[in-house]
Amino acid sequence: MHPSQIVKILLEHFETGAVFIASVNGVLDFTNREKAKAAKFLLSSSIGIHEIPVDDDWSARIFAKAIMNCCESGKKLLAWDWKSIISFFVGMYGIKIQIKGTLIDLKILESYNDAKYEKPVSFFEFMSRLKQVMLSNNWSKTNHIYKTVHLPLILDIVPELETVGILTHEKLHAHYEITGQENGRMLCYKAFNRSYVPHVITPEQKEILKPLDFESVFVYMDYKSMEVKMLGWLSKDKEINELCQSEDIYKSAYEKILKTPCDTEEKRSLCKKFLLPVFYGMSAYGISEKIGLPMKTSEAIVDRIKNIFCTSYAWIESYQKKAETDKKAEDFLGKVRNFPDKFYRARNFAVQSPAAIFCLYKLIDLYESLKNLTKIAYNVHDGYMIYSRKDKLKEVILTSHKSLVSECALFPSLYMSVSCSVGRKLTEMKSIKLPK
């Protein structure tokens, strides 16, 4: 298609005030030039539908520039998986599409409501489905999280995570779906020709993955006991929150539940295996079978947890009862998940879904604090892998730590702690003591 035609079509569509844009090809692979040449984009508005091929540098620059010029203040860009489109143009052509108008990504909004639909085929289908989302009872919460968390991830943070890469004998890239997992966490899978999945790095991969240059090292920061602290904050359980103030949550929990000293790492590890699982629905039989404890001991553990932490247990149990009645549940921040069966899963949804948003919010904070200093290599749930030049290591560690432990506006007065490790190789990461 001639560049003048691309510009003409975009101008005509944006003159209507709102344009739906999506990839015809699904997820676009910026790691493979031959696949990239097949890229096509659907444009649809009240005046009709067009498909625009973007098969070389010239057409890519014309297309991106035309969108940036046309989508000015007051215009609406209606999208399906806009994050992947940004990543494609950055990774393949080095072009960052920035718009002044309003971006509405239906894939994100529907996913937050656990609606599993395919990409709309037209502007009119998009608007019909958007209307349904906006009529939902949780729209105000959905919209707030979309603007506060999802938009920054779509426009800046996740495209950078996807395009920054990591080295072996070649550069590999991770692909993320921002609301891909049912409990709100990002989903990562191999969508590219040259890709890896940070969530399931094998021992063999750990041996060969390395930073982007010889002067850099890995810095890994991750939250400690996040779900226990989130459970305490959400349920307002004084007993849980008292545990969270202790030096070691699991050691204190073990001693509180079993009334004996937690004087070995094995005992602490045992507590980690049953504490949250009981809240999430594990029975005494499950503890006995999976952990190997006698049935009487397992029954005593379950009873003690229910009695000591009665406030939080009743709170989390209410989510299961709600799921049994309504066949769905809504978390603290308005995310909806359907439960046609296995209603007990509403228990961990009640905690893990808000925890996922907390981690994504802090990913945004971390990105903003480091953007003039270094880059984030990848994100795995409550963990963040960061690149650091050796001469900037102390600054990167302190800046990252300050960002991650600072208060989150969505969860006032909830404070987390993090651990840190550093290494040139993932198999040689050494723990670093952080300031309190």
Predicted regions and their residues:
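Conserved DEDDh/DEDDy metal-dependent 3′-5′ exonuclease domain
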Residues: 2-4, 14-134, 225
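Conserved catalytic palm subdomain of right-hand nucleotidyl-transferase polymerases, strongest
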Residues: 104-105, 211-227, 278-279, 287-293
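Catalytic palm subdomain of template-directed nucleic-acid polymerases
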Residues: 113-116, 132-134, 283-292, 384-400
